[in-house]
């Protein structure tokens, strides 16, 4: 289990003055939406215009392990995002839904942020992406994000109003491109698992990747066997120029914000190397 996103965001916001911080993501079934709105509003009030929130289904295996996986994840997420946005906007909320019930609540004027933070949907399946296009301010795509996946996701989102698209990717930069590929390779061991098929389906090597995973005893063997060309497609990795080119391709495809996740044995050194891309 990873660390708590809101606590980490609060720490980073308190230690900085300019950078924008995104929380990605809050599982809808894990928090009462009214209390989540109170916590988020506090962050947005203390650090105006510097916080964005993504809400999603959460990892199914994690949510099931604590008895929190709903019968209809789509219904819960629709209700949750809609009501969270209303609460953060200072509206009086009445709702008696399948999963969320609120009987006349609004944030007190002393607690409401001057500007409501954006609420994105962190999703990957076709129905969930369509949901995001209807109710969210944007979509957060988990890694790996390729230009082909971006185009397919936008087709399914079908936004009819301004809609942000945030893309996560594993990243490593080195003057030796092969060294960068070696660093990101272990972090790609999950992409052969079923939950990541929506990311891989638009790629020309999808069938070959599925076959490779079926022949490997486990994720580590699979990651070790990935061809270098596939690794280049599944991460932002290589020389600074190659990384910049990859990011340009993602922005051209429709990404509005790119989030790079450093990997390796020393994250601070990795961050310094990523700075060469900027």
Regions from the language model: what does each represent?
Residues 1-278:
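Active-site-adjacent structural elements that line small-molecule/cofactor binding pockets in enzymes
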């Amino acid at each position: 289990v990873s660390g708590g996103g809101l606590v980490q965001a609060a720490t980073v916001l308190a230690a900085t003055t300019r950078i924008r911080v995104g929380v990605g993501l809050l599982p809808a079934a894990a928090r009462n939406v009214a209390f989540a709105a109170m916590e988020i509003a506090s962050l947005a009030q203390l650090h105006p215009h510097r916080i964005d929130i993504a809400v999603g289904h959460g990892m199914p295996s994690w949510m099931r392990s604590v008895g929190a996986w709903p019968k209809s994840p789509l219904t819960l997420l629709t209700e949750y995002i809609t009501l969270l946005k209303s609460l953060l906007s200072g509206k009086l909320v009445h709702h008696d839904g399948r999963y969320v019930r609120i009987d006349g609540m609004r944030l007190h004027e002393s607690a409401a942020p001057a500007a409501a933070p954006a609420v994105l949907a962190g999703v990957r399946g076709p129905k969930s992406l369509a949901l995001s296009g209807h109710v969210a301010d944007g979509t957060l795509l988990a890694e790996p994000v390729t230009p082909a996946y971006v185009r397919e996701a936008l087709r399914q989102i079908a936004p009819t109003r301004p809609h942000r698209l945030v893309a996560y990717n594993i990243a490593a930069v080195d003057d030796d491109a092969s060294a960068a590929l070696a660093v990101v390779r272990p972090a790609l061991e999950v992409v052969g698992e079923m939950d990541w098929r929506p990311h891989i389906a638009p790629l020309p090597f999808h069938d070959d990747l599925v076959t490779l995973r079926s022949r490997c005893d486990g994720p580590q063997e699979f990651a070790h066997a990935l061809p270098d060309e596939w690794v280049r497609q599944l991460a932002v990795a290589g020389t600074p120029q190659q990384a910049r080119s990859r990011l340009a391709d993602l922005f051209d495809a429709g990404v509005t914000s790119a989030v790079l996740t450093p990997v390796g044995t020393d994250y601070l050194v990795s961050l310094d190397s990523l700075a060469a891309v900027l």
